[in-house]
């Protein structure tokens, strides 16, 4: 098992060079495959993601979309398909963007299509990752350096080329906070464009580099048109290490990073892959909820659990990591969802709190 902090230090000079940032190539990697109508490349290096894509949801009015009836799991989740287990697969970023920009009068469909920028370089080696390993490794054959201005020009061209609204720019990876200067520079460019919302993914591992630009980064992260999602890799240190390949001792660093975001008044959300090893699913989830509550009593209500699909790259990663004795758990993901939404959260929160969208939950 490796040290992700040292790995980040090695990757940083490759991810940022001469004022330009290393962006992953999408074309030819399998990520442009339009399997679920939600992944398609706009160009060689940039792609879109749709979050609300069911016809019956796209036809709803804004008021209907904000109904708590869309939250949680379907009835009888353990007998449903994994793909259909959640009533609304993703709340974020469309709901969080609409709420932050316009309150519950905002239409999530206006923030449904995200122009996605994928930085190359990750200090984890997750066994379920949706990104091909070569794309995450700063490989010059699968990446290219861009200035922030060049990237924003692509975004503006995409806005011209499509009829539906494109108001979200999503920064993913790789791990963005290894080069937090990218977030700062990108926001400064997007600030000139009215109505734009910036969504930032992070694996909560790079506080060292965040703190190096604390003043500028903190100023960006507290803005109303910025949201951050921190992806926790597992509910305990043992599972964290199996998932990421990192040493168990770095499990706690995720909570330190989340606390830093909260201290900086960031609009923070949490992703949690539905991957739990062994038979103690409820016990592990209960312990994880308590760890989040130690940071903020309402933070578990801002968790969006992720379904792990076997996308082409994910399937490759699963096969590779299985050979390294790090297979994804055999535990049925539906059981993890059921434990989180139907058994553990109701122990700690009222029906009123459970009926709120993540973005409505105060921190």
Indicate residue ranges for each PLM-predicted region.
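Cysteine-centered iron-sulfur cluster-binding motifs in ferredoxin-type domains/subunits
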Residues: 116-129, 144, 175
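Conserved AdoMet/S-adenosylmethionine-binding subsite of the radical SAM
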Residues: 155-168, 173-303
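Conserved alpha-helical substructure of the radical SAM core
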Residues: 133-169
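Short loop/turn segments at strand-loop or loop-helix junctions that form parts
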Residues: 118-120, 128-132, 230-236
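Short N-terminal secondary-structure initiator segments
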Residues: 57-76, 166-185, 206-208, 212, ...
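Auxiliary Fe-S-binding modules of radical SAM enzymes
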Residues: 1-60, 256-363
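N-terminal [4Fe-4S]-dependent radical SAM core
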Residues: 19-118, 133-137
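Short, conserved acidic/polar surface loops in the N-terminal third of protein domains
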Residues: 127-130, 138-142, 181-183, 210-212
């Amino acid at each position: 098992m490796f040290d992700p902090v040292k790995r980040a230090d090695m990757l940083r000079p490759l991810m940022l060079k001469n004022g330009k940032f290393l962006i992953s190539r999408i074309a030819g990697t399998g990520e442009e495959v339009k399997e679920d109508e939600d992944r398609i490349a706009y160009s060689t290096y940039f792609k879109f993601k749709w979050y609300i894509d069911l016809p019956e949801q796209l036809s709803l009015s804004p008021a209907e979309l904000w109904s708590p009836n869309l939250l949680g799991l379907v009835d009888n989740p353990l007998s449903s398909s994994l793909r259909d287990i959640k009533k609304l697969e993703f709340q974020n970023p469309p709901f969080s963007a609409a709420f932050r920009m316009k309150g519950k009068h905002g239409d999530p469909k206006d923030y449904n299509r995200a122009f996605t920028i994928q930085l190359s370089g990750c200090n984890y080696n997750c066994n379920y990752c949706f990104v091909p390993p070569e794309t995450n490794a700063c490989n010059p054959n699968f990446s290219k350096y861009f200035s922030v201005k060049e990237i924003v020009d692509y975004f503006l061209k995409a806005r011209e080329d499509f009829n539906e609204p494109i108001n979200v720019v999503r920064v993913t990876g790789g791990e963005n906070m290894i080069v937090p200067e990218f977030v700062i520079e990108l926001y400064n460019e997007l600030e000139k464009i009215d109505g734009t919302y910036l969504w930032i993914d992070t694996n909560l591992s790079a506080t060292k580099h965040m703190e190096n630009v604390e003043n500028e980064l903190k100023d960006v992260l507290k803005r109303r048109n910025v949201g951050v999602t921190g992806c926790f890799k597992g509910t305990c240190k043992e599972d964290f290490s199996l998932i990421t390949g990192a040493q168990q001792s770095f499990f706690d660093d995720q909570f330190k990073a989340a606390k830093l975001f909260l201290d900086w008044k960031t609009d923070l959300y949490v992703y949690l892959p539905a991957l739990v090893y062994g038979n103690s699913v409820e016990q592990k989830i209960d312990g994880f909820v308590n760890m989040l509550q130690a940071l903020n009593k309402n933070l578990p209500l801002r968790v969006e659990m992720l379904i792990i699909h076997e996308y082409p790259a994910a399937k490759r990663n699963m096969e590779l990591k299985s050979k390294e004795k790090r297979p994804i758990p055999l535990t049925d993901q539906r059981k993890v969802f059921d434990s989180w939404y139907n058994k553990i959260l109701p122990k700690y929160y009222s029906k009123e709190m459970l009926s709120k969208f993540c973005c409505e939950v105060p921190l």
